[in-house]
Amino acid sequence: MAQTEIYIINKDRHLSGEYVGVNGAMQGAWLIWMELEKKYLPSLPLKPWDNPGEYKSRIARRFDEHAMDEIWAIPRMKETEWSDRILMEIYMDSAYVGYDDLHEVAEALRNCEFATDNMKGQADALEKIHEEYPGILGVFINATSVCSISDFLDCLYDDDGEVLDMRLKEDAYDAVQYLRDMEKCDWDIEKYFETVGDE
């Protein structure tokens, strides 16, 4: 069964080697993307052979280049609720959750209208990490163990291909802080890069 993997990040941006696995990854980020797509985006146009009234998702076309771009833009849409922004942003490829925001992210996962056992399990794990690991930078969440973490992290391997060390990539960013900065810029990405992005 695919798991959502939550990795602990030390202050030096290296992963501690410890992680929490939460079963049922398809009921985590994947479900969040599907539900928030329906909430904020219109259905794709139906074909004659589609069922009338059916919601046609962009996710079904995920292997087409740019098919998911509108979904990834949901956190920056002005009408998106704050907790939904968090639910989307924490799973972005280069995002991590800062230590001080673990409680807020846990609440967003636990209290969303379609919360599943996976989401509640993630929330419990984040609360426990906050309690047991003071002083860490935060956590990196790999949406599903089916994905290779080397796609999102810099990994150092030994001669046998075993991972010796993992660290955040240079372009990794604090997901919730990014949303706060974007809110100050009224969700204007160009204004963000002019004012905050170059800091």
Question: Where are the regions that the model predicts?
Answer:
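Short, extreme N-terminal segment that most often corresponds to the first beta-strand
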Residues: M1-D50, F193-E199
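Acidic, proline/glycine-rich low-complexity IDRs
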Residues: M1-E5, N10, E127-E199
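Context-gated lysine
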Residues: K11, K38-K39, K47, K56, ...
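Short linear sequence elements within intrinsically disordered, low-complexity coil regions
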Residues: D12, G24, E35-K38, A60, ...
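Feature targets compositionally biased, intrinsically disordered low-complexity regions
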Residues: S16, V20-N23, Q27, P52, ...
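Low-complexity, serine/threonine/proline-enriched polar segments
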Residues: I32-F114
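Short amphipathic alpha-helical segments that mediate assembly, nucleic-acid/protein binding
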Residues: P52, M68, S83-D84, L102-V105, ...
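Charged linear interaction tracts used for macromolecular binding and regulation
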Residues: A73-I74, W82-C155, G161
